[in-house]
Design a protein with these regions (language model features):
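Serine-hydrolase catalytic machinery in alpha/beta-hydrolase-like enzymes
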Residues: 1-81, 91-94, 98, 217-219
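Primarily recognizes the serine-hydrolase "nucleophile elbow" in alpha/beta-hydrolase
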Residues: 71-127, 138
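Short, proline-enriched alpha-helix->beta-strand connector loops that line the catalytic pocket
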Residues: 124-129, 199-203
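Short beta-strand/loop motif that positions the catalytic acidic residue
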Residues: 131-133
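Catalytic active-site module of serine/aspartate enzymes centered on a nucleophile-bearing elbow/loop
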Residues: 222-237
Length: 237
């Protein structure tokens, strides 16, 4: 993928102008160990069936990018958010864990947590999270992915249980209806939310019933616009 690919999927420029926030679409740092490809390097141990041990990581790149933006345009370091789709969503979970000291909140579309990210996640502050996932996504399976007895992707439930526990949220979710404004897209949306006792931090999950490996609002479900919903929630923090 590339920055232009993500821009085509989720063009947030008008939203950034109207809401007055700085918007950045970075390209992944070229991986010297993998033919200079620019896919986000999420895990480095080779634990996934399609990866080999690789010391290259884009975490340091994003770490330095945040510092650069602070120096160049004086971004508010207390309000830095990351969002991503598919592999970029896995990388976003990784940022929320491994760069938690610099990431305020995250939004992830069409991905659950990698098992390695889940096992090594270190959260230093309550972290608002928004997830959007179709229950018929056969690339980022809603129930997780296990291959030859090894768990590679956590289920959606396990992913949310992690953030519920580490954000000290109440375990019971609130279910809200989402209007089915497009009756021809073959899907509907349910919104699940969890809050802390003082309602200072939240977790939101948009479950797309009948949804695939999509970015709702651009393709697939058309009842919500993924990036608008993510900003709506994360901008509260």
């Amino acid at each position: 993928g590339s920055a232009n690919d993500q821009l085509a999927i989720a063009d947030m420029r008008d939203l950034a102008d109207s809401e007055n926030f700085i918007l950045v679409y970075p390209d992944a740092f070229p991986d010297p160990n993998s033919g200079q490809e620019t896919n986000w390097q999420v895990v480095t141990s080779g634990d996934l069936p399609f990866t080999l041990p690789n010391p290259h990581s884009d975490i340091l790149f994003i770490d330095q990018l945040i510092d650069h933006l602070h120096l160049e345009v004086n971004i508010d370091l207390n309000r830095v958010y990351a969002l991503g789709y598919s592999n970029g969503g896995g990388f976003t979970f990784d940022l929320g864990c491994r760069l938690n000291n610099k990431i305020t909140g995250i939004g992830v579309v069409a991905r659950t947590m990698y098992a390695e990210t889940y096992d090594n996640c270190i959260v230093t502050h309550p972290t608002p999270v928004v997830t959007i996932l179709g229950d018929e996504d056969y690339i980022s399976n809603y129930d997780g992915i296990t291959y030859e007895g090894t768990l590679y992707y956590q289920s959606s439930d396990a992913t949310h249980e992690y953030w519920i526990a580490n954000n000290n949220l109440l375990p019971t979710s609130n279910l809200s209806s989402v209007p089915n404004i497009n009756t021809t897209d073959g899907s509907t949306v349910e919104l699940y939310s969890w809050s802390s006792e003082d309602e200072c931090i939240d977790l939101y999950h948009y479950k797309v019933i009948g949804g695939g490996h999509d970015w709702p609002g651009t393709f697939g479900n058309m009842d919500i616009v993924s990036h608008e919903k993510i900003w709506e929630h994360l901008s509260e923090y």
